[in-house]
Each structure stands twice: as C-alpha cells, then as structure tokens.
Amino acid sequence: MLTLKIVVYTVVIFFVSLFIFGFLSNDPARKPSRKDIR
C-alpha cells in the first residue's frame, strides 16, 4: 500500500506541475496574441 500511495502522489504532483507550467506559458497577460484583448 505504501508504494501505491507514493506512485499516486508522484502522478498527482506531476500533473499539477504540468498544469501550472502550461497555465503560466499560456498566460494571455504575458502573450497578448489572443483576439479577446483589445
């Protein structure tokens, strides 16, 4: 059970870090390339 919990925590941290890096790289405030910003 301990190894399963470690694997689950590793996957969760990996996806959370991926989501955070993707959100920061696709931030519309830093890259005003979208047509929504006038």
From Swiss-Prot:
Native source species: Cyanophora paradoxa
Residues that span the membrane, as ranges: 4-24
Superkingdom of this protein's organism: Eukaryota
Entry similarity comment: Belongs to the PsbI family.
Subunit structure: PSII is composed of 1 copy each of membrane proteins PsbA, PsbB, PsbC, PsbD, PsbE, PsbF, PsbH, PsbI, PsbJ, PsbK, PsbL, PsbM, PsbT, PsbX, PsbY, PsbZ, Psb30/Ycf12, at least 3 peripheral proteins of the oxygen-evolving complex and a large number of cofactors. It forms dimeric complexes.
Annotated HAMAP family: PSII_PsbI (MF_01316)
InterPro entries given in the database record: PSII_PsbI, PSII_PsbI_sf
This protein's UniProt keywords: Cyanelle, Membrane, Photosynthesis, Photosystem II, Plastid, Reaction center, Thylakoid, Transmembrane, Transmembrane helix
UniProt-annotated location(s): Plastid, Cyanelle thylakoid membrane
Matches recorded under SUPFAM superfamilies: Photosystem II reaction center protein I, PsbI
Physiological role: One of the components of the core complex of photosystem II (PSII), required for its stability and/or assembly. PSII is a light-driven water:plastoquinone oxidoreductase that uses light energy to abstract electrons from H(2)O, generating O(2) and a proton gradient subsequently used for ATP formation. It consists of a core antenna complex that captures photons, and an electron transfer chain that converts photonic excitation into a charge separation.
Disulfide bridges in this chain: none
Protein name (database record): Photosystem II reaction center protein I
Membrane-protein topology: Single-pass membrane protein
GO biological process: photosynthesis
GO cellular-component term (any): cyanelle thylakoid membrane
One matching Pfam family: PsbI
